[in-house]
């Protein structure tokens, strides 16, 4: 059944938003996996775990925001299966941050692709929504992860376990 509030909302935009919801849920699921990996008794980097748990929550909120906007515009939410994270073991903090950086770049590219669909279908509401709610935040996340990777390397990772401990205690502890 078609929505009575739908206006200037192309079916391609609606489908692309549903795919983006799935991407955000996948990112949330991946960050949740990372969080509980670093919370294990044999890893015990609790501030790193907390950081990844916060990232998971943020990605889930992004998915919910997209779904809310989909409903507001008169679109229909069609959820897909969420793929499991690419791995279960995340190695050291440097490896996990590098994986997180790649994930954020993938999410950012998906958002840019969604923006292009909105632009191609002349949907200023979608473009404004993405520009206001997502794009700047993605750039900030990518920069933050890049900074963390630089500092982890500076501390001697992956060879230096003490550097990983200090990063967890001081860098991640301060951002809590």
UniProtKB/Swiss-Prot annotation:
EC number: 1.16.3.1
Residues where Fe cation 1 binds: 24, 59, 62
Entry keyword Phosphoprotein: no
Listed result of changing residue 135 to P: Reduces initial rate of ferroxidation and accelerates iron release
Keyword set, alphabetical order: Iron, Iron storage, Metal-binding, Oxidoreductase
Protein residues bound to Fe cation 2: 59, 104, 138
GO terms of molecular function: ferric iron binding; ferrous iron binding; ferroxidase activity
Enzyme class at the top of the EC tree: oxidoreductase
An annotated GO cellular component: cytoplasm
InterPro entries linked to this entry: Ferritin, Ferritin-like, Ferritin-like_diiron, Ferritin-like_SF, Ferritin_CS, Ferritin_DPS_dom
GO biological process: intracellular iron ion homeostasis; iron ion transport
Reactions it catalyzes: 4 Fe(2+) + O2 + 4 H(+) = 4 Fe(3+) + 2 H2O
Every Ferritin-like diiron domain range: 7-156
Result when mutating residue 83 to Q: Improves crystallization
Family, similarity comment: Belongs to the ferritin family.
PANTHER family: FERRITIN (PTHR11431:SF54)
Other remarks on this protein: There are three types of ferritin subunits in amphibia: L, M and H chains. M and H chains are fast mineralizing; the L chain is very slow mineralizing.
UniProt subunit comment: Oligomer of 24 subunits. The functional molecule is roughly spherical and contains a central cavity into which the polymeric mineral iron core is deposited.
Described function: Stores iron in a soluble, non-toxic, readily available form. Important for iron homeostasis. Has ferroxidase activity. Iron is taken up in the ferrous form and deposited as ferric hydroxides after oxidation.
Protein name per Swiss-Prot or TrEMBL: Ferritin, higher subunit
């Amino acid at each position: 059944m078609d929505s009575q509030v739908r206006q200037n909302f192309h079916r391609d935009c609606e489908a692309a938003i549903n795919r983006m919801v799935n991407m955000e849920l996948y990112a949330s699921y991946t960050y949740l996996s990372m969080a509980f990996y670093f919370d294990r008794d044999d890893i015990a980097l609790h501030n790193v775990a907390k950081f990844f748990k916060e990232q998971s929550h943020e990605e889930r909120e992004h998915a919910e925001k997209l779904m809310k906007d989909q409903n507001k515009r008169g679109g229909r939410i069609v959820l897909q299966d969420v793929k499991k994270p690419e791995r279960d073991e995340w190695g050291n903090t440097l490896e996990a941050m590098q994986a997180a950086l790649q994930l954020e770049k993938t999410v950012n590219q998906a958002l840019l692709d969604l923006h292009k669909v909105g632009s191609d279908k002349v949907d200023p509401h979608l473009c404004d929504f993405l520009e206001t709610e997502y794009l700047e935040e993605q750039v900030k996340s990518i920069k933050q992860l890049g900074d963390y990777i630089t500092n982890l390397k500076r501390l001697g990772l992956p060879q230096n376990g003490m550097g990983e401990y200090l990063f967890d205690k001081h860098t991640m502890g301060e951002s809590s």
